[in-house]
């Protein structure tokens, strides 16, 4: 069957067929390519809006963009719409798709658009946010809406879609404005791809770290404490502690020095750094003795002050500081999401002060660090360089030097990378580390950032080999990004079945009766001396119930102890990952767990 053209590609810009005048452009076919899905999903957002308007004539619409894996639309409606209403909206969408309605585009001036939609306050909001000039409107049947496009030429291309959830969304993301209704959905070019995606979504629900965090007693949140402020329970704290200790050892082996800066700094320091002018809305401030202070959103200023605490020579460089730095950032309530988006979190943060000639060497060393750690947790990953944003400090030449150094390091390693134009932090370009989990979802975690600007702002110096004062380069570096986010991702990646070496409880010990508890506690103590946490299930319950409780906690290993095991000083082992049961002497078991702990290579 011949493929149908759904749009065209002009360099990196997708142009729908309604707008094409130059037929020499590259054709985008109706399939599951990135470009085609953008057109299909954008069009499906309008199809959904058309269906909603048909079912709820009073509905007014704000914006309906394409997002990763789908689309959404924000709108106002008098009726309360819940998950149960998605079925009838989908049914109406299918009717409209089967009607094969032509989708057309026309343009008017902004002033004409303001007049056309004068009785629609949400359209007025949209129009006030866009520049003067021509405004494009897409029309299908009786429905039309403001949109830049691109869109499919006909609703017949919109057959394989699914509305996934209903949520609330503040108008324009402003918590002080009204709450609109938001419906999310996704769409594909064929039934099989949609089915595969929905299967992944169902699996993701089972793996949701918020659900598993509760079931495995890792962490909790409390409204009296406040949103975005996780409380770590014993299991979660053990998991996190093991991760922290492992990373501490890796850092020390790689030449990093542990440091710790204050969490509260005078606003003067944030003014020098540029955070006050460029990042203030994301920070928390307070007054102490009529002096303004800011809680740190990043650790860099503290590390700069540690660098300045002594005279530095070229012989000292590179100087590597690392800290598990607790930071706070003001996040709107609507974007908070489990451990993925919080207001307080701990970064595995490091800053490397080096000479310009050492940049590439240090970036290469960081990339090796990243590779070792990601392989340890069975993550694949990719890199993306983020370049100078619109709001930035430092001149273009400095940015160019820094960006070039990052590209050269990645090229030397033969690593593929993308470019996120304008996605850098305000003080320097960066490499974003994006990991892929077991469900093939991509997550942005760590960063590597070259910074010439902060050393200049704080007048950092070192003495070179000619006894002259020079300015060092500063590399910002986080591998995990934050412990909270990484643990959330890891929990979903392994469905709560953590690797033995960081499992909060690695071994469940199940004594069959009271006579076997002493032996169970003896084993527990021996394991603890090896830094392996275990739990003895000593309640007066049936053996099957004890084992079931341990299995629900997804423990890597379960030991069952009865008369025979006590007499022979042995264990009946159930290995969850190997999916096997066997009897071992206690010495053999201890040797086995030592081997599992030694499998962690740095």
Curated annotation (Swiss-Prot):
It is an enzyme of class 6 (ligase). Zn(2+) binds at residues 300, 351, 476. Signal peptide: none annotated. The keyword Metal-binding applies. One of its GO terms (molecular function) is ATP binding. Its EC number is 6.1.1.3. Keywords: Aminoacyl-tRNA synthetase, ATP-binding, Cytoplasm, Ligase, Metal-binding, Nucleotide-binding, Protein biosynthesis, RNA-binding, tRNA-binding, Zinc. It is found in: Cytoplasm. InterPro entries: aa-tRNA-synt_IIb, aa-tRNA-synth_II, aa-tRNA-synth_II/BPL/LPL, Anticodon-bd, Anticodon-bd_dom_sf, Thr-tRNA-ligase_IIa, Thr/Ala-tRNA-synth_IIc_edit, ThrRS_anticodon. Residues 208-499 are annotated as: Catalytic. Binds 1 zinc ion per subunit. Its cofactor is Zn(2+). GO terms for cellular component: cytosol. It comes from the Bacteria. It holds the Pfam family tRNA-synt_2b. One of its GO terms (biological process) is threonyl-tRNA aminoacylation. It catalyses: tRNA(Thr) + L-threonine + ATP = L-threonyl-tRNA(Thr) + AMP + diphosphate + H(+). Disulfide bonds: none annotated. NCBIfam families: thrS. Catalyzes the attachment of threonine to tRNA(Thr) in a two-step reaction: L-threonine is first activated by ATP to form Thr-AMP and then transferred to the acceptor end of tRNA(Thr). Also edits incorrectly charged L-seryl-tRNA(Thr). Belongs to the class-II aminoacyl-tRNA synthetase family. This is Threonine--tRNA ligase. It comes from Campylobacter jejuni subsp. jejuni serotype O:23/36 (strain 81-176).
């Amino acid at each position: 069957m011949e493929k149908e053209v759904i749009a065209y590609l002009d360099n990196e810009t997708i142009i729908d067929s309604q707008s094409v005048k130059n037929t020499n452009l590259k054709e985008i076919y109706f399939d599951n390519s990135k470009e085609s899905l953008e057109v299909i999903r954008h069009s499906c957002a309008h199809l959904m809006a058309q269906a909603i308007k048909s079912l709820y004539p009073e509905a007014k619409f704000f914006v309906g963009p394409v997002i990763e894996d789908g689309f959404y639309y924000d709108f106002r409606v008098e009726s309360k719409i819940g998950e149960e209403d998605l079925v009838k909206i989908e049914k109406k969408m299918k009717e409209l798709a089967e009607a094969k309605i032509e989708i057309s585009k026309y343009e008017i001036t902004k002033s004409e658009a303001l007049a056309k939609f004068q009785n629609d306050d949400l359209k007025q909001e949209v129009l006030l946010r866009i520049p003067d000039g021509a405004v494009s409107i897409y029309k299908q049947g009786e429905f039309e809406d403001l949109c830049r496009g691109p869109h499919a030429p006909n609703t017949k291309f919109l057959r394989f879609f699914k509305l996934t959830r209903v949520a609330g969304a503040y108008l324009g993301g402003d918590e002080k404005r009204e709450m609109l209704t938001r419906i999310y959905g996704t769409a594909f070019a064929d039934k099989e791809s949609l089915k595969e995606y929905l299967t992944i979504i169902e699996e993701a629900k089972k793996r949701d770290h918020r659900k598993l965090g509760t079931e495995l007693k890792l962490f909790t949140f409390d409204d009296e404490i406040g949103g975005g402020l996780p409380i770590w329970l014993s299991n979660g704290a053990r998991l996190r502690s093991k991760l922290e200790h492992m990373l501490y050892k890796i850092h020390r082996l790689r030449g990093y020095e542990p440091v710790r800066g204050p969490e509260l700094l005078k606003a003067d320091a944030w003014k020098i750094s540029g955070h006050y002018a460029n990042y203030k809305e994301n920070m928390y401030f307070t007054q102490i003795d009529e002096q303004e202070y800011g809680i740190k959103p990043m650790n860099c200023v503290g590390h700069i002050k540690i660098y300045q605490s002594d005279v530095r020579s070229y012989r000292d460089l590179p100087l590597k500081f690392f800290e598990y730095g607790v930071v706070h950032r003001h996040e709107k309530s609507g974007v908070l999401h489990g451990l993925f988006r919080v207001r307080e979190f701990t970064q595995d943060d490091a800053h490397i002060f080096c000479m310009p000639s050492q940049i590439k060497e240090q970036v290469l060393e960081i990339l090796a660090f990243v590779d070792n750690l990601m392989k340890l947790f069975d993550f694949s990953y990719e890199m993306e360089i983020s370049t100078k944003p619109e709001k930035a400090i430092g001149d273009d030449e400095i940015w160019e030097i820094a960006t070039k150094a990052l590209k050269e390091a990645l090229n030397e390693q033969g690593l593929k990378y993308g470019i996120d134009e304008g996605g850098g932090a305000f003080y320097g370009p960066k490499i974003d580390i994006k990991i892929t989990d077991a469900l093939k979802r991509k997550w942005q975690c760590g960063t590597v950032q070259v910074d010439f600007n902060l050393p200049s702002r704080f007048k950092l110096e070192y003495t070179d080999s000619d006894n002259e004062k020079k300015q060092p380069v500063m590399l910002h570096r986080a591998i995990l990004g934050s412990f909270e986010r990484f643990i959330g991702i890891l929990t979903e990646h392994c469905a709560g079945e953590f690797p033995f070496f960081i499992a909060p409880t690695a071994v469940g010990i199940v004594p069959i009766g009271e006579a076997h508890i002493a032996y169970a506690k003896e084993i527990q103590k021996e394991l603890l001396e090896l830094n392996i946490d275990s739990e003895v299930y000593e309640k007066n319950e049936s053996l099957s119930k004890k084992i079931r409780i341990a299995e629900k906690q997804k423990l890597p290993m379960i030991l069952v102890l009865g008369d025979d095991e006590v007499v022979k000083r042995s264990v009946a082992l159930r290995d969850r990952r190997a999916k096997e049961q066997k009897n071992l002497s206690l010495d053999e078991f201890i040797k086995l767990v030592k081997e599992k702990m030694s499998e962690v290579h740095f």
